[in-house]
């Protein structure tokens, strides 16, 4: 699809979204065709909700988020088959694997372990491995990435190449508010078990999050070496663990107020060190 075609497609979706109150399951023609085309492009990885430029800036293609939202208005609730014991579900979004045969799986080139769930319009790159996990619509999972057991990749989240999302990790989804960017995990990151990255935060390339690290937009991310406090973004090649900071306030009874949770950057490493050092060794203080 040419840039001109994409521009025309995005304009159709933008216009439809402005008049979304008139879009429903009975809508036919250009609007439905445009949304279906956008979802197919997302599903195949030919377009992404967010794209990284050479300088590290991420640009969000809001029109693709709007296409996903419009699809909820266009598609009726229906039975979704394939559950254990011939059980069914009730939803508006089909499985990515609906109608797939051996040919489609071989062409896609990733591994989908039984009981993983991937919704249509999510893209899974070759050599990725999906353990029993959940990947929501509009998400992007890069080449060679492991999505471990009970991990969740939220709507429109962007996961880079050679990332490891450990067991029970939650990567938040962002469809609304419309102006919000998706949660992003860049290439070669390791996210420890039961950690959560949400609310459009970014974990930059090569970073390691230890087990049980929680990062949202309001979470303080503290560099232990410099004392710098940042929000919403983990710098490249950072090693991060869960910690706490003194609140600096006093309770009514005169006692110091409880410490508050923060994420602590315990060290920063270069690309060479990151590639040669085991995760457990990096996390040791």
UniProtKB/Swiss-Prot annotation:
GO terms for molecular function: 2,3,4,5-tetrahydropyridine-2,6-dicarboxylate N-succinyltransferase activity. It is an enzyme of class 2 (transferase). It is found in: Cytoplasm. It catalyses: (S)-2,3,4,5-tetrahydrodipicolinate + succinyl-CoA + H2O = (S)-2-succinylamino-6-oxoheptanedioate + CoA. Keywords: Acyltransferase, Amino-acid biosynthesis, Cytoplasm, Diaminopimelate biosynthesis, Lysine biosynthesis, Repeat, Transferase. Pathway: Amino-acid biosynthesis; L-lysine biosynthesis via DAP pathway; LL-2,6-diaminopimelate from (S)-tetrahydrodipicolinate (succinylase route): step 1/3. One of its GO terms (cellular component) is cytoplasm. It holds the Pfam family Hexapep_2. Substrate binds at residues 111, 148. It comes from the Bacteria. Belongs to the transferase hexapeptide repeat family. Homotrimer. This is 2,3,4,5-tetrahydropyridine-2,6-dicarboxylate N-succinyltransferase. It comes from Rhizobium meliloti (strain 1021) (Ensifer meliloti). The lineage of its organism: Bacteria, Pseudomonadati, Pseudomonadota, Alphaproteobacteria, Hyphomicrobiales.
